[in-house]
Amino acid sequence: MTPQDNEDIWAQMYKATRKEYHPEDVSPFIQAHHVVAAVQSAKTGKIYTGFCIEGASGVMNLCAERVAALNMYMSEGNLIARRLIACRDKAPANGGTPCGACREFFMQAAYENREMEILTDFETRKTVLLKDLIPNWWGDKRYKV
């Protein structure tokens, strides 16, 4: 039994994000580590973290949520997430969900991700499902084929 066994999964995930949070300027054009995220693998239950990296040119940006998912994929070849938390200097409170690009990424990565829980309020443990953030998603037809 580990010390983390006494913490709920959201506390474990939040603690994991804190290790990644240390905003820094990589160059005069690029910032990193000012948004952090953790995903829990639906396959193994392991927690994977990521941090954002943003440049002056928007096409180079990588959100923390997608970096966490890519870390999961690199480690276990899996893109199905059970849970997601993203934050800055404090735990999520009163909302805060992944951007549209991240929502779309998770929807396209695996049909099962529509059931992914996204923490919107750490204090109350309030969550929302990804499918509720993208009702009537355009890609449903492809998955049903």
Predicted regions and their residues:
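C-terminal binding/interaction regions
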Residues: 1-30, 75-145
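Short beta-strand scaffold segments in enzyme catalytic cores
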Residues: 30-42
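Gly/Ser-rich catalytic serine loop of serine hydrolases
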Residues: 35-36, 60, 94-96
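Hydrophobic "anchor" residues
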Residues: 46-47
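Compact, glycine-rich, soluble single-domain proteins
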Residues: 51-66
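Short amphipathic alpha-helical face segments that pack within enzyme cores
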Residues: 63, 67, 101-104
